[in-house]
């Protein structure tokens, strides 16, 4: 099995820069699996005013990731049992990933880390777009596409389920059938980097 990290673009002033370096190392150490990062390359560091990323740049980044994923399928690289971890679940390429895997009969698993979305009134999607049908239906579709939907806290899970009530039946299950999992974000690397400040 190979774990493919479909990462979020690294912004120097955010933890996404640290994840680019440390997340592959942590996953390799904890799973003993082969880990590969599917990166979209360099991205503009200037963020869209009022946001933490560049609204145009993030889509260029994701388009480059999608091209790589498509080529990996074309070249026969993706195998049964491979796992794709999206470090930001709000990535529409997950839909095309599932499309290719199912049409080609390749049994993969996909996980996504939900940071925010239209269901969060503090997020730019919640503030600027709100509950427009296109954004809500996109988030529903992405949720269903993921085998594992990872959230950092019960607060975040509750906020999601308050908006998408139909997904509440996944919360609290302790079987493999659950699609909702509360996990801590992968920041174990901070222990070493913060020890100097004790």
Residue ranges and their predicted role:
Residues 99-106, 165-166, 184-185:
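Catalytic phosphate/metal-binding cores of nucleic-acid and nucleotide-processing enzymes, i.e., regions
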Residues 14-18, 94-99, 122-125, 159-164, ...:
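A short acidic (Asp/Glu
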Residues 83-90, 101-124:
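Active-site proximal beta-strand in glycosyltransferases
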Residues 180-198:
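Conserved donor-binding/catalytic core segment of Leloir-type glycosyltransferases
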Residues 58-62, 124-131:
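Short, flexible loop segments at the rims of nucleotide/cofactor-binding pockets, characterized by
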Residues 133-179, 189:
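A short, active-site helix/loop in glycosyltransferases that binds the activated sugar's phosphate group
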């Amino acid at each position: 099995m190979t774990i493919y990290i479909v990462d979020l673009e690294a912004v120097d002033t955010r933890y996404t820069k640290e994840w680019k370096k440390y997340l592959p190392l942590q996953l390799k150490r904890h799973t003993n699996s082969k880990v590969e990062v599917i990166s979209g390359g360099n991205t503009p560091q200037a963020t869209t005013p009022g946001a933490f990323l560049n609204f145009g740049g993030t889509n260029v980044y994701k388009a480059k990731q999608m091209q790589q994923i498509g080529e990996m399928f074309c070249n026969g690289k993706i195998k049964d049992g491979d796992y794709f971890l999206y470090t930001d679940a709000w990535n529409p390429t997950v839909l095309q990933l599932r499309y290719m895997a199912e049409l080609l009969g390749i049994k993969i698993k996909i996980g996504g880390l939900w940071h925010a979305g239209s269901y969060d009134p503090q997020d730019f999607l919640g503030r600027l777009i709100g509950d427009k049908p296109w954004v809500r239906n996109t988030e529903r579709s992405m949720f269903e596409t993921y085998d594992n939907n990872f959230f950092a806290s019960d607060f975040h899970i509750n906020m999601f389920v308050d908006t998408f009530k139909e997904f509440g039946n996944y919360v609290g299950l302790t079987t493999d059938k659950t699609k909702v999992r509360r996990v801590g974000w992968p920041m174990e690397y901070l222990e070493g980097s913060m020890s100097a400040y004790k």
